[in-house]
Amino acid sequence: MSDVQVHQLYIHGRYVEATSGKTFNSINPANGEIIATLQQASEQDIEAAVKSAQQGQKIWAAMTAMERSRILRRAVDILRERNDELARLETLDTGKAYSETSTVDIVTGADVLEYYAGLATAIQGEQVPLRESSFFYTRREPLGVVAGIGAWNYPIQIALWKSAPALAAGNAMIFKPSETTPLTALKLAEIYTEAGLPDGVFNVVQGAGREIGQWLTEHPVIEKISFTGGVETGKKVMASAAGSTLKEVTMELGGKSPLIICEDADLNRAADIAVMANFFSSGQVCTNGTRVFVPKSRLADFEKAVVERVKRILIGDPMAEDTNFGPLTSFPHMEKVLSFIESGKQQGAKVLIGGGRATEGELAKGAYVLPTVFSDCTDQMAIVQEEIFGPVMSILGYETEEEVIQRANDTTFGLAAGVVTQDISRAHRIIHQIEAGICWINTWGESPAEMPVGGYKQSGVGRENGLTTLGHYTRIKSIQVELGDYQGIF
């Protein structure tokens, strides 16, 4: 324990001692070892972070957009220079394979920051003539202090997705990382400071989600909450934000996304996409296509192709460069996923491969769950209806296009969806009827910085990434100007 580093809060450009006197540990899910101890924020610390953010935001907003853009671009450069170091830390904290964190997590987060750094100078109002002597113009002004609440599956990427548009628009952000995977958010704060961000513009307060989340969502100074996490928690955050000061919210919540394989699909391509849509990041992706609909006439061939590919997955030490499937991010989450797998068996689904915990050799020390594929599934099963957030694929047979569209939409979620077909007209016809915010045709999973992402129904409110998101970190002020005489009416 003496060798374990203790991490403080990051407020006003430096590490500061938390006042709560409480700490919690970050656990390496590959072996159960403690990798860091973190101090937990108190309500007093939240107040300090808010005051700091208010001070820093005034300085930041007073800078020109070009100055803000240059600082954010410097942060991008530092992120890319330190990519491998950050990826190793992310792997230690999350259990995700280094082959993934080194090529995706930091890379895509930096891409989003670069995108919004470029848009900082494009924030502008408009001027509209009303008559010869009068016109009005608009200004897009920053909201002020905003808060981001992150999830545990993509810690640094989520921190960047939330902070990039907020900072580009001239706001300050207080960020609360998941207590399960808090380490890289602190590194990001260091990088922002190194790049020249004024003190207080990006503060990190870690600790128990329920307490800190409530303090942030109810704080009268904070103007917006951007939250990523589960549906039930999201509802509470949204209600609290509305009940306090009518804060604007962005909610990126859960999913149970359908992947529809059409009868004309190339089965090799379809199987590749299905495996990617279920087992990337050990299945811990909110957009996973966990309900895989396949024509009954092609079920046997598709199932065979999927099993062949799952057998090629390399489970192991996430730091090993050839590993492409690591442990789940925590031991409690592993138990939750295993309970879903058992319920699938009990409800009559057939295990084609996997179906339990990986216990061979050193894997027994970690939170490893075997990539699992179920067939003979029905729409009423828990594994088909509920978000598992783990490496569990459910294959469902169907007969007609109308049937599969109805079944795909028969869910409270609406985050993502996909179609695999060689008929592009059919692809668009199906996708246009699917109730989901992020859709893919003949591919799965890519979320470029330019593309807005978010859900329908209970999968979320608002969008992240893309041009539309930037506007939600500003407010519009309208100003009418009269150049002529003013005629009173009283």
UniProtKB/Swiss-Prot annotation:
What does the entry comment about cofactor binding? Answer: Binds 2 potassium ions per subunit.
Q: Provide the GO biological process annotations.
A: glycine betaine biosynthetic process from choline
The UniProt similarity line reads: Belongs to the aldehyde dehydrogenase family.
Q: Which domain of life is it from?
A: Bacteria
Q: What is this protein called?
A: Betaine aldehyde dehydrogenase
Which residues get modified to Cysteine sulfenic acid (-SOH)?
C286
This protein's species is Acinetobacter baumannii (strain SDF)
The protein's matches in HAMAP family, at most eight in alphabetical order, are given as: BADH (MF_00804)
Q: Where does K(+) 2 bind?
A: L246, K457, G460
Give the metabolic or biological pathway: Amine and polyamine biosynthesis; betaine biosynthesis via choline pathway; betaine from betaine aldehyde: step 1/1
Question: Catalytic residues?
Answer: K162, E252, C286, E464
User: Assembly and interactions?
Assistant: Dimer of dimers.
What cofactors does the UniProt entry give for this protein? K(+)
Which residues are involved in binding NAD(+)? G150, A151, W152, K176, P177, S178, E179, G230, V231, E232, T233, G254, C286, E387
